[in-house]
Amino acid sequence: MLDLISRVFGRDHSSADIARERLRLVLVHDRTNVSPQFLETLKEELIEVISRYMEIEEEGMDVTLQTAENQVALVANIPVRRMKRAAVGSKR
């Protein structure tokens, strides 16, 4: 959903950037047997949860699955603008 909103109202990406991102998602799928849709959904949900606690720059966000031997690691690089004083819905 967030991806759709970004496409309609958001940033312009070059066709090379879009092709590179699609290729990266295909390679991740091949190596980890995870669909590109799964990875995109994971990224959107991470944005939703992390945004409760801090303001982030979604444009610079990078979420990947890396494989080494028989292990898979989720690696997220998320630029943080600032921390929020209290989490939304916090009981404090």
Curated annotation (Swiss-Prot):
Pfam annotation, one family: MinE
Keyword list, A-Z: Cell cycle, Cell division
Entry-linked InterPro entries: MinE, MinE_sf
SUPFAM superfamilies per record: Cell division protein MinE topological specificity domain (SSF55229)
Family statement drawn from the similarity comment of this UniProt entry: Belongs to the MinE family.
Family matches, as NCBIfam families: minE, PRK00296.1
Protein name: Cell division topological specificity factor
Protein species of origin: Symbiobacterium thermophilum (strain DSM 24528 / JCM 14929 / IAM 14863 / T)
